[in-house]
């Protein structure tokens, strides 16, 4: 049962981290290179070797998807916009014919997030490798977002530490942070509702929120319809008595 729980939980996390097509390719490779022994059991060595390959590829795929050009900018669900409290200022600028300036600012925020996301893969892999049997059971039997919540708990601090300096550097390239600070520190002198002048902190939070949003969508898919996304090996494992809790 221990080996089955390890396989199920890690594959669930892998599927949450990578796209459908990539996940199927990875799992097929595991089946081909690490076949089940007689009786349908996988050895500890098989599982360790297969998961090492799967986790490395899956985590990299996840990072690649979001760090690609327009990975954030052209995804309406996670595109980073100006803070809500700054939207009145944005409207004023657009009314004054400075819409292109605002558009460039928004683009710079998303480019910074895309740059930072390149560092996500090794952080996710470290978290998955540290997963205990208790963690695995909780994920397997948990709610729709158990894997996502596990990753949030284990990686948010590390992601923040890794992302913020990259985002800061990316924004500094276009002087975005300086302009932001100058404009909104001045604005805050007269405004009742202050605007946070820490632009890199704002973008970091939004980038991390976007990553976990994507992970949660993938987790829901595999939980609601696992048969449609796994190989024969996973169908067999999900249908086992141990996996069903009997």
Predicted region positions:
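Mid-length scaffold segments of soluble, non-membrane domains
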Residues: 99-170
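N-terminal Sec/ER secretory leader and immediately downstream segment
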Residues: 26-108
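Bacterial N-terminal signal peptides that target proteins for export
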Residues: 1-8
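An amphipathic alpha-helical core segment
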Residues: 166-208
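C-terminal motif of bacterial Sec signal peptides marking the signal peptidase cleavage site
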Residues: 15-19
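Bacterial signal peptide processing site
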Residues: 21-24
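Alpha-helical transmembrane segments and their juxtamembrane interface "caps"
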Residues: 66, 98, 119, 149, ...
């Amino acid at each position: 049962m221990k080996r089955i729980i390890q396989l199920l939980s890690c594959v669930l996390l892998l599927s949450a981290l990578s796209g459908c097509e990539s996940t199927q390719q990875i799992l097929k490779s595991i089946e081909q290179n690490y076949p089940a022994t007689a009786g349908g059991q996988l050895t500890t060595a098989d599982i360790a070797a297969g998961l090492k390959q799967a986790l490395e590829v899956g985590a990299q795929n996840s990072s690649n998807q979001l760090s690609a050009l327009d990975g954030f900018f052209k995804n309406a669900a996670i595109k980073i916009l100006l803070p809500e409290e700054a939207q009145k200022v944005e409207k004023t600028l657009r009314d004054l014919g400075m819409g292109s300036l605002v558009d460039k600012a928004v683009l710079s925020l998303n480019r910074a997030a895309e740059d930072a996301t390149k560092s996500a893969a090794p952080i996710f892999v470290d978290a998955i490798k540290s997963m205990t049997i208790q963690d695995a059971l909780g994920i397997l039997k948990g709610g729709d977002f158990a894997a996502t919540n596990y990753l949030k708990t284990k990686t948010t601090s590390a992601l923040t530490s890794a992302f913020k300096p990259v985002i800061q550097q990316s924004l500094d390239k276009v002087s975005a942070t300086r302009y932001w600070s100058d404009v909104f520190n001045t604005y805050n002198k007269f405004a009742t509702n202050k605007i946070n002048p820490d632009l890199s902190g704002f973008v970091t939070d939004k980038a991390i929120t976007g990553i976990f949003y994507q992970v949660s969508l993938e987790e829901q898919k595999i939980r609601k319809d696992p048969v449609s996304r796994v190989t024969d090996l996973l169908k067999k494992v999900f249908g086992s008595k141990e996996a069903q809790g009997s």
